[in-house]
A protein has these predicted regions:
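N-terminal Rossmann-like NAD(P)+-binding domain of SDR-like oxidoreductases, especially those catalyzing
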Residues: 1-191
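Active-site proximal helix/loop that lines the substrate pocket
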Residues: 99-105, 141-144, 194-200, 226, ...
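A conserved pocket-lining segment of Rossmann-fold NAD(P)-dependent short-chain dehydrogenase/reductase
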Residues: 106, 157, 187-198, 209-232, ...
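Hydrophobic alpha-helix immediately C-terminal to the catalytic Tyr-X-X-X-Lys motif of short-chain
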Residues: 171, 175, 179, 209, ...
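CheY-like receiver
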Residues: 85-89, 127, 212, 240, ...
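Short, surface-exposed alpha-helical segments at coil->helix boundaries
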Residues: 55-58, 173, 207, 262, ...
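C-terminal substrate-binding subdomain of Rossmann-fold SDR/epimerase-dehydratase oxidoreductases
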Residues: 22, 213-328
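Residues in well-ordered alpha-helical elements
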Residues: 80, 92, 104, 111, ...
Length: 328
């Protein structure tokens, strides 16, 4: 299967590209390398972690190169360039991953966030329609739901997002469905939550907890630690995406792809301190972040055969060991 990964040099994309290649598929990565990636990080390389983040993005690129996965330096905001690239390769499936994947940064710079989220999405959808792609997979977010109305929700929960990031993800879902309805483009929407794993540089919560524990001997929690997230190890998400790409029953469907069990920030912090002894500090809550909880994965289990493998404890242990090896 030939798969085009738009924004594929990012955290999720490079893991997905490597998994596709490992099983014999033909992935091609298209990325401008300007959002949460090498080019943007080089501009602010002062301090320990910005330098390490640059090294992580370089490792991503090296891994793609070592596995002979083409990395095309292409800005998906440029419709003409993107259409030429995809028309030449004619992928069977297109996966749209491009975004400014950070709630606070999205609220501070809505114009850039719109450009890299919706403009790239519309371009990719229209090129997919034009070349007759067999499947278009859109990478949405739990933030599209807005504040969860109950501790556990499924895919029928209404979309009532707060802030720029979640609103653009929800808007993207409506645009995807419009192309599905108007043009018959087979589409699949994936909603993840609280991802973590090697070579993440986008400031996700587990990344931040581990890095401040390593660097400062402290973990800082927003609020009292009772807020919950459905923490999901990156390889579980990748497994879910692969199942969705493979299964014809996933066409024109939306799936929660998570662990399926929310845990509190305090539980996460205590899990990190078990491996990295440090202090836990509590601070003010961030009102821009919606309340979340468990995202039920019954649909993905039933239709796709999805079964997450990583508990929070095992996933964090592996992630911390990766940091130790990377920094050695």
């Amino acid at each position: 299967m030939k798969v085009a990964l738009i924004g594929g040099a990012g955290f999720v994309g490079h893991h997905l590209a490597l998994a596709l290649k490992a099983r014999g598929d033909d992935p091609v990565v298209y990325d401008s390398l300007t959002v949460n990636n090498f080019c943007s990080l080089v501009e602010k390389s002062e301090g320990r972690w910005p330098r390490e983040w640059i090294n992580m993005t370089v490792e991503r690129i090296n891994l793609l190169h070592d596995k002979k996965i083409p990395l095309i330096h292409c800005d998906a905001r440029d419709y003409h360039r993107l259409s030429l690239e995809l028309a030449a390769r004619r992928p069977d499936s297109i996966v749209h991953l491009a975004a400014v994947a950070h709630i606070d940064r999205s609220n501070k710079d809505p114009q850039t966030t719109f450009d890299h989220s919706l403009r790239t999405l519309e371009n990719a959808l229209d090129v997919g329609r034009a070349i007759g792609a067999g499947r278009f997979l859109y990478f949405s977010s739990s933030t599209a739901y807005g504040p969860f109305q109950s501790p556990e929700i499924d895919e029928t929960h209404p979309l009532q997002p707060q802030g720029v990031y979640g609103s653009l993800k929800a808007a993207g879902e409506y645009i995807v469905r419009a192309y599905q309805t108007a043009y018959g483009l087979p589409c699949t929407i994936i909603r993840p939550q609280a991802l973590y794993g090697p070579r993440c540089v986008s400031g996700r919560v587990i990344q931040k907890f581990i890095e401040t524990a390593l660097d400062q001997g402290v973990i800082r929690i927003e609020g009292d630690g009772s807020a919950v997230h459905d923490f999901t190890e990156i390889s579980d998400l990748v497994d879910g995406i692969l199942l969705a790409l493979d299964n014809p029953r996933a066409a024109n469907e939306t799936f929660n792809i998570t662990t399926g069990q929310a845990r509190s920030l305090m539980a996460l912090a205590l899990t990190v301190t078990f491996h990295l002894p440090c202090q836990i500090e509590k601070g003010p809550e961030n009102p821009e972040k919606p309340s979340r909880g468990t995202m039920k994965i019954d649909k993905a289990k039933a239709l796709l055969g999805y079964e997450p493998k990583w508990t929070l404890e095992d996933g964090v242990e592996r992630y911390i060991q990766w940091y130790r090896d990377f920094l050695a």
